[in-house]
Regions:
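Amphipathic alpha-helix face/heptad-repeat signature
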Residues: 24, 323, 327-330, 354
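A charged, amphipathic alpha-helical module
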Residues: 32-41, 46-51, 55-204, 336-418
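Short active-site oxyanion
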Residues: 202-206, 281-284
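Structural motif
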Residues: 207-212, 285-289
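Histidine-anchored nucleotide/phosphate-binding helix
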Residues: 210-226, 298
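N-terminal glycine-rich anion-binding loop in soluble enzyme alpha/beta folds
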Residues: 222-236
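Active-site and donor-binding regions of nucleotide-sugar-utilizing enzymes
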Residues: 232-326
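Alpha-helical scaffold elements adjacent to nucleotide-binding pockets in ATP/GTP-utilizing enzyme cores
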Residues: 299, 326-333, 337
Length: 418
């Protein structure tokens, strides 16, 4: 029965928001003044010259590509038409981070790529439209939200050079990650006290440190577990490596040594300059992946003193029987903490239902490893690595929709291998 329920709970999207419109107007006024100042300080002559140079460079590139095609033999043109281009480095202009045009992958693979592109855009627009105003308003509160506008370009980079089933598999896996991120961005916007301010939804939100395994929320099907720093700090830095620089700079100016790990440093910096939403019923911190997370938890407690915090201390020697018992007791205490803070009750049925899915997803993952150990690996590239990282840590069998993706990817994998 649990698998037949819609996921995530539609009631989470329908939760009523209580936006302070005066605060939104004041923030919009401040953003407008910053934008006006940027416009005034822009060197428009240099900007115009750069656009002119780009235009001339594009004209030269088109002429160069036309000459290259004209100089090909019939067999080479047929190969280009069916299998796509091979010199992918020419898609980048010197000094630019974006490609000058989309990759030509051959007729079939270009259609596959375009279909995946359309599907992703449709999902993103559909998800954000579930509560559009708070979602879009996030861009006026937090700089990291702007970087998500580049997510489809990020997908293109992760699939560069791929063809056929390899491209299909990458699109399937990327779609699930993007859907998870889009849904949680909407929830962050709805719950944030500066933005949507939904007290109805905040009562059901349990925040946890981004490196804390999300499986603990499988036993609370009526609650919403969100890896708190994942979207504002960690995942967005995969898309835009410059996003976290202001946060690291801020926390080092605050006195944090510069030799700390940049992950917790970025989290602390985001707290220092108020770049994280104020939301949730409680927060679960942990010592994963290192002691830096413990440091970040102290910043979290100081920034939001009204948010109850439970510290999970995972044992390093996890194969030792005594540490396993200690870890189990800590998990039990964490479950009790969530029950006390939210009023929800732990469900073993819901938990084991999710773990059954997770075990099945892990079995599919091991099959990928077996194929990739051979001389004919079928699934490679960043999309595969990112999907696995997200699946085992953030999802962990909780979302029943992921099972369908795992089956599709496995079918394509074996079809290509055989």
């Amino acid at each position: 029965m649990a698998d037949k329920k819609k996921f995530p709970n539609p009631a989470f999207f329908r939760a009523r928001t209580e936006m302070d419109w005066r605060a939104q107007a004041a923030n919009l006024k401040e953003v407008g003044s910053i934008a006006l100042e940027l416009i005034k300080e822009t060197d428009w002559k240099a900007f115009g010259k750069k656009q002119k140079d780009h235009f001339l460079d594009n004209m030269n590139r088109v002429a160069r590509e036309a000459r290259a095609v004209a100089g090909m033999s019939c067999a080479q043109r047929k190969d280009l038409l069916l299998n796509g281009e091979k010199q992918l480095g020419t898609l980048y202009r010197k000094g630019d981070m974006a490609t000058v045009r989309r990759e030509w992958r051959g007729v079939e693979s270009t259609l596959i790529d375009f279909a995946g592109w359309l599907k992703t855009w449709g999902m993103l627009l559909g998800t954000f439209s579930k509560d559009l105003i708070p979602a879009l308003n996030t861009t006026f509160w937090y700089r990291w939200m702007i970087s998500y506008m580049c997510c489809v370009s990020f997908m293109d980079k992760n699939t560069m050079g791929q063809r056929g089933n390899a491209l299909r598999m990458s699109h399937l896996m990327t779609y699930d990650i993007f859907r998870y991120v889009a849904e949680n961005l909407v929830f962050l916007a709805k719950c944030d006290k500066k933005n949507g301010n939904s007290s109805e939804l905040n009562k059901k939100v349990v925040l946890f440190d981004e490196m804390t395994m999300g499986q603990i929320m499988a036993g609370f099907p009526d609650l919403l577990g969100i890896p708190y720093q994942l979207m504002p700090v960690f995942l967005v830095s995969e898309i835009d490596q410059l996003t976290c620089v202001p946060y690291i700079d801020a926390v080092e100016s605050f006195g944090l040594p510069a030799d700390c790990c940049p992950v917790p440093s970025s989290e602390c910096g985001a707290l220092v300059i108020d770049a994280l939403p104020h939301m949730g019923k409680c927060f679960i911190s942990s010592s994963m992946p290192c002691d830096g997370s413990t440091m970040a938890s102290s910043y979290m407690s100081r920034r939001f003193p009204d948010l109850p915090v439970f510290h999970l201390c995972f044992p390093v020697r996890y194969e030792d029987e005594e540490t396993v018992q200690m870890g189990a007791e800590d998990i039990r205490a964490c479950i009790k903490f969530i029950e006390e803070q939210t009023g929800a009750k732990w469900s073993w049925d819901a938990y084991f239902s999710a773990m059954k899915r997770f075990n099945e997803e892990t079995r599919y993952e091991l099959e990928k490893w077996e194929v990739n150990k051979t001389a004919y690996p079928q699934i490679i590239g960043p999309s595969y690595e990112l999907f696995r990282k997200w699946n085992y840590e953030m999802d962990g069998g909780i979302d029943p929709r992921v099972m369908k993706t795992c089956r599709k990817v496995n079918d394509l994998l074996m079809q290509s291998y055989q």
